[in-house]
Amino acid sequence: MFGKAGLGGLMKQAQQMQENMKKAQAKLAETEIEGEAGNGLVKITMTCAHEVRKIDISPDLIQEAADDKEMLEDLILAALKSARGKAEETANKTMGAFTQDLPPGVGDFFR
């Protein structure tokens, strides 16, 4: 099916793709995404590797939520979900560029 030269070239391409994907994953691990809830009253900054780096709660919300712990918890959770969704979307776009021309399932071998 493949000659020695063809198989060697294919392996070299696969190794190069794997190296490029590792570099992209390292960059994503440092790329910060912000999610928010309550029209910006709660903001969460996380990396595309899902490491939460910052939680910002508006002082106005803290005063308003003094008697409504559940509302504050809901807003924090919503901001976290927003950030996570954006992080996953960014990661999928970045990593998808490497595997878009491969047959289905083959790209999983490079992760």
From Swiss-Prot:
It is found in: Cytoplasm, Nucleoid. It comes from the Bacteria. Disulfide bonds: none annotated. InterPro entries: YbaB-like_sf, YbaB/EbfC. Homodimer. Belongs to the YbaB/EbfC family. This is Nucleoid-associated protein NGO_0742. It comes from Neisseria gonorrhoeae (strain ATCC 700825 / FA 1090).
